Structure formats: C-alpha cells, structure tokens
Amino acid sequence: IKFLKKINNSYFYSEGNRENLFFVIEIAKILKIKKKNLLKTLKKFKGLEYRQQIIFKSKNLTIINDSKSTSFSSSASILKLMSNVFWIVGGLAKKGDKFLLKKKNCKHLKAYIYGKNKNTFINELKNIVQYESFTNLKILIKKVFLDIKKNENLKHKTILFSPAAASFDSFKNFEERGKYF
C-alpha cells in the first residue's frame, strides 16, 4: 500500500486502470524489476489517448477525454470516483445498455446529452441525474463552459467526455470524436 501511494498518478484512479496497475505490479515482482524503476515509470505513465485521458488540470477544474467509452458501464466506472461532474454523454446507444449507478451516487452530476439516440439516454437517465439535451456537440460544449462559469463556487469540477455510446452517428470513429472534443 505504501508503494501505491508513492505512485500518485491520476491515470490509475479508475477501477479498471487500478486493476491493470495491480497486474503490472505483480508481473514486475515476477520479473524482479526494481521498485524504484517501476515507480519512476508508473509516475509518468500517461495511458492511451481518449481512454480516461486528462487533457487539462488546474486547481479547480479537470477535463477528461474518455471518447473510447461506448457503454454506460465504462462511463460509470469513472463517474463513481468523482463529484461535481459535468458529464457529456451521447451518440449511438448500445441496445439493452443500462445505467446502473443509483441516484444517491449522482448528486453532484449533470449529464449533457447529444446524438442520434439522445432520447434513449434521456429515458435511461431522467430519474437519476439532472440533464439537458442538445442537437450537437458544439452547442453542448459551449453550455458546459457556461455552467462551469456559473458554478465557480464549486471546488474540483470535472468535465467528463465519456459518451457511453458508439460515435458513428456523427464521427468516423472514437478517435475522430476524441480529437473533436
């Protein structure tokens, strides 16, 4: 546990990335990699683009590009860890996908919904989170920043671009969607 605290890399905050970290640590033990070398590498590890990628961080605002997220479960894993989240969600919903976080876990969460299947997202989220819907991502992003400005008193705000959907309604792929964001 002491070793984990020394890593201090926000990339490993999410459940999935933490599981990968534990796997890497176990492999490093088997391969007899020196702890100081492993620590040095893990501290500066950035991960892959568009996968819970922190693209901006200041004292009170973090912006995360998780364009790779194509299901509610992939978005929920990171949503569970945060408060004061401005969540950008939408695109082509996966059939039968369900949002499993409870209302009590979503008190400090607002969803900004867009995309071809926005009504599917609205129906899934309407009784759980506060939300607004938009015709396109460009208008939505402007509104997120207006809301951020209106809520200046909130500490540690996060803009989370984690669409929980496929990108093909507006983009060629999740990479193009991530670049656009």
Regions inferred by a protein language model and the residue ranges of each:
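Nucleotide phosphate-binding/pyrophosphate-handling subdomain across enzymes
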Residues: 10-108
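A structural signal for short, well-ordered beta-strand elements
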Residues: 31, 130-133, 170
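Short beta-strands and strand-loop turn motifs
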Residues: 159-164
